[in-house]
């Protein structure tokens, strides 16, 4: 019996591996992106204490503001149509499970927006909330339940987790075919390797590329700089841009003269999480800037007592960049929309 159980387990692992490595990245008509052709040291960025002098150029660049809300809405309209077709064909809809630990204000806001987006597009959503002091065992128990639930096609663990929890161990518990956040090591690894295709690409990088393409920005052959190298955005962003044939440089907290390197870029992806880190003087005139940063900064004049600030000094970038995403209203809506797309694709692999 033990031998049979071991063979069954080996067979299951083999099946999961084959799923991860074969070409199953099903691009529907929803997105315009084409098919995909030690970092443990702390990132201690040192932001400017005083703003640098204003940058002036002989001719001021007219900057296009890339509206992520409009582009996200176009994609969501198609998602609604696809979900409707699925429901009519098989009587089922995609299902997304979200695990939220603790009561961190920004995490609650992000989860609330994701649940709302599911409701608006016809995707079923289930929210599991656990206390700040919960154990890894409690979270893993919830994940196992969702892994076995056939009505759930995507599972998302809202990050960051409390410090006493092993983030890698918890994320690795999500079944590969339900890893709609694209954080599983096999998904990231297959993104990095030629001849391999991940089941899912991380939502924020995927949304950034979609924004670039829909704005008419050519990626192939361009010099791109990614500022930040987190597992969530920076690292997969660099890998994805390489898949689109960009020449990619990564700038991080240990980079010498980051301004000089960034100023060579045709495309700048700012994902360091440091408000106003990238000044106008960092940018090459005509560069396209995608600002991933969304740091909450206290502001009593705002409804919730804070406002979101990007990594790029927006006012200084205007007139230098040829195009830029605002914060908020740029990358954020696209990240959630790519989560919906990944959940839909996960369900399609089961039903269609």
From Swiss-Prot:
**Which pathway does it serve?**
One-carbon metabolism; tetrahydrofolate interconversion
User: Per its UniProt entry, which superkingdom is the organism in?
Assistant: Eukaryota
Q: What is this enzyme's EC?
A: 1.5.1.5, 3.5.4.9
Task: Read off the Pfam families from this record.
Answer: THF_DHG_CYH, THF_DHG_CYH_C
Write out the catalysed reaction: (6R)-5,10-methylene-5,6,7,8-tetrahydrofolate + NADP(+) = (6R)-5,10-methenyltetrahydrofolate + NADPH; (6R)-5,10-methenyltetrahydrofolate + H2O = (6R)-10-formyltetrahydrofolate + H(+)
Q: Which UniProt keywords apply?
A: Hydrolase, Mitochondrion, Multifunctional enzyme, NADP, One-carbon metabolism, Oxidoreductase, Photorespiration, Transit peptide
Q: Where is the transit peptide?
A: 1-23
UniProt similarity note: Belongs to the tetrahydrofolate dehydrogenase/cyclohydrolase family.
Protein function: Catalyzes the oxidation of 5,10-methylenetetrahydrofolate to 5,10-methenyltetrahydrofolate and then the hydrolysis of 5,10-methenyltetrahydrofolate to 10-formyltetrahydrofolate.
Q: What is this protein called?
A: Bifunctional protein FolD 1, mitochondrial
> Where does this protein come from, organism-wise?
Arabidopsis thaliana (Mouse-ear cress)
Mind giving the lineage of the organism this protein is from? Eukaryota, Viridiplantae, Streptophyta, Embryophyta, Tracheophyta
